[in-house]
């Protein structure tokens, strides 16, 4: 029995939810998010609550039940409040700037790294802090991970791009010789 799947998802005010075949559609203003369930779960929309039910008794059906409920809850939170991730740049000469739809990073390479900002995401830069925000949890996390991957933090001086809440375990340098 999925403990996540059996909990109902509350729909915040201002968001309309409808069912289009096996696709759940959530609208807030001109934003629209769709979740295709492929008929793997039963869906019941009751006012401001959406409940999911298992279709079969297979082990895989229970997994899909909890997964689709969690994905739909992420859509509700994204449309209501949005998601954001913060990254911190550490290092001499390391900089970031937004130019149009491109994030320009100077990370100690012989060239600048240009990161194309994906559709639906917003990136802000304040000194050495990069904030990635948007309504799609997966897209926000993916973009933040791609930016971090250009220059992950190294354990000796901590130079690189890291999440603001990430703890870098530091290593001691080489011991001095005789």
Curated annotation (Swiss-Prot):
Gene Ontology CC: one annotated term: cytosolic large ribosomal subunit
Annotated GO MF terms: rRNA binding; structural constituent of ribosome
SUPFAM superfamilies in alphabetical order: Ribosomal protein L6
Keyword vocabulary terms for this entry: Ribonucleoprotein, Ribosomal protein, RNA-binding, rRNA-binding
Entry superkingdom: Bacteria
GO process terms (BP): cytoplasmic translation
Keyword flag 4Fe-4S: no
Role this protein plays: This protein binds to the 23S rRNA, and is important in its secondary structure. It is located near the subunit interface in the base of the L7/L12 stalk, and near the tRNA binding site of the peptidyltransferase center.
HAMAP family: Ribosomal_uL6_B
NCBIfam families: L6_bact
Subunit relationships: Part of the 50S ribosomal subunit.
Family according to the record: Belongs to the universal ribosomal protein uL6 family.
PANTHER family named among the record's database cross-references: 60S/50S RIBOSOMAL PROTEIN L6/L9 (PTHR11655), LARGE RIBOSOMAL SUBUNIT PROTEIN UL6M (PTHR11655:SF14)
Protein name stated in the entry: Large ribosomal subunit protein uL6
